[in-house]
Amino acid sequence: MDKEKYSFMNPKGIETFAFIFSGNALQWLHGTTTDDNGRKIGNFTLFGDLLARMALADGTAKGFHRPLTLSVGQAQYSEEQLSTQWSMGRKRIRRLLDELARLELIDTSRSRVASVMTFPCLLQWMTKDGSVVSNPFIHKQRERIEPL
């Protein structure tokens, strides 16, 4: 897949989000990453693309070789797929995901069967129909913070 043909995804079906970011995470989100072709991509665009993969309801993820049951707030991903879509090498994708985990923007769980990420910085979201969903994957130290 040519990145020029890939349209970065935006979360669908969500009216608003409530996040909590560290200062370092905010700095990263406002920065850019250069792909293998020398094009700059806003880091918030990359984060939004990952967030758009998040399950909004419990169910089976489609589009991968092996179906995987996901809970609300989880996203299945493939480093190989991200590498192709974002025009970056797989090692670079791995380092980028590791950096996002260090900044507590995502948590990842990798296995031979599937790779799953969660978004511990996401407190809750409101769907288009007005229902509020609390993120079940908030880090423990964040649970004491009251969302707006």
Where are these regions (language model features)?
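Short recognition helix of helix-turn-helix/winged-helix DNA-binding domains
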Residues: 1-79
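Winged-helix/helix-turn-helix nucleic-acid-interaction surface
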Residues: 1-11, 89-148
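A generic structural signal for solvent-exposed, polar alpha-helical segments
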Residues: 23-27, 34, 83, 92, ...
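Winged helix-turn-helix DNA-binding recognition segment
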Residues: 54-118
